[in-house]
Amino acid sequence: MTELAGASSSCCHRPAGRGAMQSVLHHFQRLRGREGGSHFINTSSPRGEAKMSITSDEVNFLVYRYLQESGFSHSAFTFGIESHISQSNINGTLVPPAALISILQKGLQYVEAEISINEDGTVFDGRPIESLSLIDAVMPDVVQTRQRAFREKLAQQQASAAAAAAAATTSASVSQQNPSKNREATVNGEENRAHSVNNHAKPMEIDGEVDIPSSKATVLRGHESEVFICAWNPVSDLLASGSGDSTARIWNLNENSNGGSTQLVLRHCIREGGHDVPSNKDVTSLDWNTNGTLLATGSYDGFARIWTEDGNLASTLGQHKGPIFALKWNRKGNYILSAGVDKTTIIWDAHTGEAKQQFPFHSAPALDVDWQNNMTFASCSTDMCIHVCRLGCDRPVKTFQGHTNEVNAIKWDPSGMLLASCSDDMTLKIWSMKQEVCIHDLQAHNKEIYTIKWSPTGPATSNPNSNIMLASASFDSTVRLWDIERGVCTHTLTKHQEPVYSVAFSPDGRYLASGSFDKCVHIWNTQSGNLVHSYRGTGGIFEVCWNARGDKVGASASDGSVCVLDLRK
């Protein structure tokens, strides 16, 4: 595996779902207090030996980061607003990924160590009877039971040791009378022990033939926080990535590039006191224009920005009153469309940086947008509605209703005739501008559907002789391929073990890449549904994407890494 350290130059992602964290939020909201101020929590050990002060701001920030990293971005946003995360003085770029989990693990180890200490201060000699869960660790009855079990096992060990010593004394003369037989038993005992270890069941692994070798994987290092999104330049092998470290980066993967500079760092700054200072906000969305000369980024600081391909800031677009969740260029390249938590969508003039029109039709945060053509687009929201709007019109030209929970993503098919939507209500719906109700209401996933993608096949594509497909990725750890003409699922792809955040078709539509929080990128044959390539990274995968030639897959991860898989033979 090649690792590029990446020299700095001078210069959407929105994980969904929230139900599972409601009790956690409730607990920490109580801790924070009704006004959201910073409170001190004084703690000490049971023996009163050590004291520490923990501010609720610190606890809130770690919970907020945990929600983001685990994909509960709606919950993270709500919790961040109520706990005033943006007003805290914590520099998020200095906090490592999985910080809350790390602290919890250390606390769990402390409790296990405490259980293992006897009343006389000696340490119990032996492994825990069984592993201690996080819930067990906070329940006094369970801890006391474990301590009693430890003491009982210690007593048994002491009794067994005494009996063994007595038996050893009795058999000593027998051993001396037949030393060769004793040595033989010892040697065989070692052999049997080794055989027993090697005979343990191993976790099932993917067939070695599909594993992508490390020589075909390049890991790009440089980001200092999780990388939410990545996108290939449509013309050249430049890979853009957006991170929680308040930067986007452009990685040059062209084979003829000199190896001196592996990345351009696009620092997202805001103006304070006449100076540019880091925004310390996540870069949540990015998109290249059609000819690959400009990159647009959206940030939690509420600004969209346009950058040149060599990393220079061309313009800053500021009219949203809160984080930007999604951002897209139109095909012509003259307009940029953005969706914000302020419940609005905005069309921007890419040349002047001015807002052409703001659309305030949603009653809750807008989560995703997609252009139907150069003037018309669709938007979806946590308000469960989908609006189709057109530049110059002061009201939606169409509104689709039918989902019973937040609508996470929307995508027009290549012809612009059909609109697909997916939701936390576990359904996938297909809409037409010709009717009010959905054409298909597809129900097969058993958890929230996070994202969807149409294949680049069928009418209005460069692959007109191949049937069009739709892929859906869900928190149920599966990916499904759909025949939309018949309204049926043709393949269920089940190798992932954790929520699937991203899917992407190869340019010819023959392959599908999927990325999951299980750290795996899988490449599937879309006709057979077979797994053809697999790669396990070092962090949960937020985004996967194909380059224009279809021979490389980029993936962004929760540990700050960006991986490029070379699929050429």
Swiss-Prot record:
Residue ranges occupied by any LisH domain in the UniProt entry: 55-87
N6-acetyllysine found at: K153
Residue ranges of the region described as Disordered: 170-195
Alphabetized UniProt keyword annotations: Acetylation, Activator, Isopeptide bond, Nucleus, Phosphoprotein, Repeat, Transcription, Transcription regulation, Ubl conjugation, Ubl conjugation pathway, WD repeat
Name by which UniProt lists this protein: F-box-like/WD repeat-containing protein TBL1X
Transmembrane segments: none
Family listed: Belongs to the WD repeat EBI family.
Signal peptide stretch: none
Role: F-box-like protein involved in the recruitment of the ubiquitin/19S proteasome complex to nuclear receptor-regulated transcription units. Plays an essential role in transcription activation mediated by nuclear receptors. Probably acts as integral component of corepressor complexes that mediates the recruitment of the 19S proteasome complex, leading to the subsequent proteasomal degradation of transcription repressor complexes, thereby allowing cofactor exchange.
Annotated F-box-like domain residues: 92-137
Chain's gene name: TBL1X
SUPFAM superfamilies noted in UniProt: Quinoprotein alcohol dehydrogenase-like, WD40 repeat-like
A Gene Ontology BP annotation from the UniProt entry: sensory perception of sound
InterPro entries in UniProt: Ebi-like, G-protein_beta_WD-40_rep, LisH, Quinoprotein_ADH-like_sf, WD40/YVTN_repeat-like_dom_sf, WD40_repeat_CS, WD40_repeat_dom_sf, WD40_rpt
Taxonomic path: Eukaryota, Metazoa, Chordata, Craniata, Vertebrata
Organism encoding this protein: Macaca fascicularis (Crab-eating macaque)
Subunit composition and interactions: Homotetramer; dimer of dimers. Component of the N-Cor repressor complex, at least composed of NCOR1, NCOR2, HDAC3, TBL1X, TBL1R, CORO2A and GPS2. Interacts with GPS2 (when sumoylated); leading to protect GPS2 against degradation by the proteasome. Component of a E3 ubiquitin ligase complex containing UBE2D1, SIAH1, CACYBP/SIP, SKP1, APC and TBL1X. Probably part of other corepressor complexes, that do not contain NCOR1 and NCOR2. Interacts with histones H2B, H3a and H4. Interacts with MECP2; recruits TBL1X to the heterochromatin foci. Interacts with USP44.
Any GO CC annotation of this UniProt entry: histone deacetylase complex
Main location: nucleus
Sites of the Glycyl lysine isopeptide (Lys-Gly) (interchain with G-Cter in SUMO2) crosslink: K332
PROSITE patterns on file: LISH, WD_REPEATS_1, WD_REPEATS_2, WD_REPEATS_REGION
Residue ranges of WD repeats: 222-261, 278-317, 319-358, 361-401, 402-441, 444-492, 495-534, 536-568
Location of the protein in the cell: Nucleus
